[in-house]
């Protein structure tokens, strides 16, 4: 059965989209529901999200952010208060029109995001500069009625965290925006082993209603970019629309400066597409629901299960570990846990017990070694760290090898047609050039990176004076 499972995974080189779908299903991360675009997060998938959520929640609380919960429903009149915001989300909004058989006096939007609710609340609770800042975070689900859906990457309903903060000064809100972006970047790199590029979105790509949007971008196995997280500086755009004022230190009324930021289960999609292979999922150790699986060999023989249980007791002091004592064959179990991407597999049988050793197999490299049972508590944490670093470095090498610098429109078109990955090119800052590159080359601007390079004097599209270097690419 397990071999059939492995064979059923489409090779990523043949059909990347199907390879991805096969993995999320066969690794038992999700199942499809009866509503298009709504996924069922199975225990293994939800445990992964819980581990990610736990780390992020601790980091946010350590920086004085507080968790709150806003309602799921937004009155239509409230949603329409910020013009750019409502226009940006209008095509994706799901509406509630009836309560039972009774038609509602006003339509209710099922939240696509909660800016308007936070703004309404802030306008009621802020009076003076003494009430600032307010640093709020919410864990919830949101609904966006997507036309094309794929598990984790683009779903009608998804889980996320959304942060909303208000500040006394423009400097404070800008610092918050960038601090959160850095928090997201370190989470991706230090926990998910996904290298990111930090930068600012163009006017065309920024969040509806924002003064500026900052992003972390990652490169997937198929050469497409994934926007892994965003942080927005609203300036006073929303506070003016919602009349969120405070008395400043000079006794004058001022509008608050505001931020918004979020990451979602989309990160799980990124994790899959950066690390996994044609044998299944590859889990970054720090967020893996199970870090070590023990497979007893000839478990019916006396002492084998007892020894496996003893080892579990030692290992659980340093890692998340499970024993598979089911009646399935060892071969089935090997394939099953390879499919699920568990970082380390330990095999222990009668001969191993005689030699006081176990067989240790790494999921990421398939490397096998014999290790003394007495060394496991020390070896496993070090190996998990080694696996994390190996996954990160491998992903970074892949990204760097698939990043191309171009200086002309023709060169850019040729690279976009023949290669897959990021394209670095200079840009004049004009919307017309950005749209032309989208239409004629098939790439969108991913970000204006903080780490700028001067590749040429002229814009890659129009030849006019360039203002900055931009990462371009095909994207999810």
Curated annotation (Swiss-Prot):
Its main location: cytoplasm. Homodimer. It comes from the Bacteria. PANTHER family: BIFUNCTIONAL GLUTAMATE_PROLINE--TRNA LIGASE, PROLYL-TRNA SYNTHETASE. This is Proline--tRNA ligase 2. Pfam families: HGTP_anticodon, ProRS-C_1, tRNA-synt_2b. It is found in: Cytoplasm. It catalyses: tRNA(Pro) + L-proline + ATP = L-prolyl-tRNA(Pro) + AMP + diphosphate. Gene3D superfamilies: Anticodon-binding domain, Bira Bifunctional Protein, Domain 2, C-terminal domain of ProRS. GO terms for molecular function: ATP binding; catalytic activity, acting on a protein; proline-tRNA ligase activity; transferase activity.
